[in-house]
């Protein structure tokens, strides 16, 4: 009896691993169908008990594998740009720019996951799929990300994604008016404005 139970558990484990792998492969395949796009987005942040923390909106330009311009227009303006090597974060309100190497960006940051769409990143997650919805759970609980969910159509259009942190805070981004077309390279270049403080962490 114990032998059959052990075999059953082994088979179940193998099946589960295969399901996770298939879901991850499907997700990566869908994202690969659209390599550059522009979209508007709305953001809603809620606490663990569901209370509204913040709402916002902005625009997004992306070109895989490593180029993006994430511009938040409300409630406060900020810009996060990757030029392929450096990750620039500009906050006009405090007149500060932070520069870090993109290669040092954590793989458990949802937007970096989407932008890279690299198998080595997805392999760090258990991926479950239900139709166009994909749910990702980190295999390691050492990071701040508890769960990541994304809705991607079969033609590669991202409808929305949600990041849930370890403390239960949830950030949901809904993408609208996505235009799948080439993006001007100028969207992915950044020069710190004169007079701002530069916090250069590329050391």
Swiss-Prot record:
The keyword Secreted belongs to this UniProt entry's keyword annotation: no
Predominant place of localization: periplasm
Gene3D superfamilies membership: Lipoprotein localisation LolA/LolB/LppX
InterPro entries, per database record: LolA/LolB/LppX, OM_lipoprot_carrier_LolA-like, OM_lipoprot_carrier_LolA_Pbac
Stored SUPFAM superfamilies: Prokaryotic lipoproteins and lipoprotein localization factors
UniProtKB keywords: Chaperone, Periplasm, Protein transport, Signal, Transport
Secretion signal span: 1-20
Membrane-spanning intervals of the chain: none
Subcellular location, record wording: Periplasm
GO cellular component terms, semicolon-separated: outer membrane-bounded periplasmic space
GO biological process, one term: lipoprotein localization to outer membrane
Function: Participates in the translocation of lipoproteins from the inner membrane to the outer membrane. Only forms a complex with a lipoprotein if the residue after the N-terminal Cys is not an aspartate (The Asp acts as a targeting signal to indicate that the lipoprotein should stay in the inner membrane).
Self-association state and partner proteins as the record states: Monomer.
Similarity comment text for this entry: Belongs to the LolA family.
Name of the protein described by the UniProt record: Outer-membrane lipoprotein carrier protein
Gene that encodes it: lolA
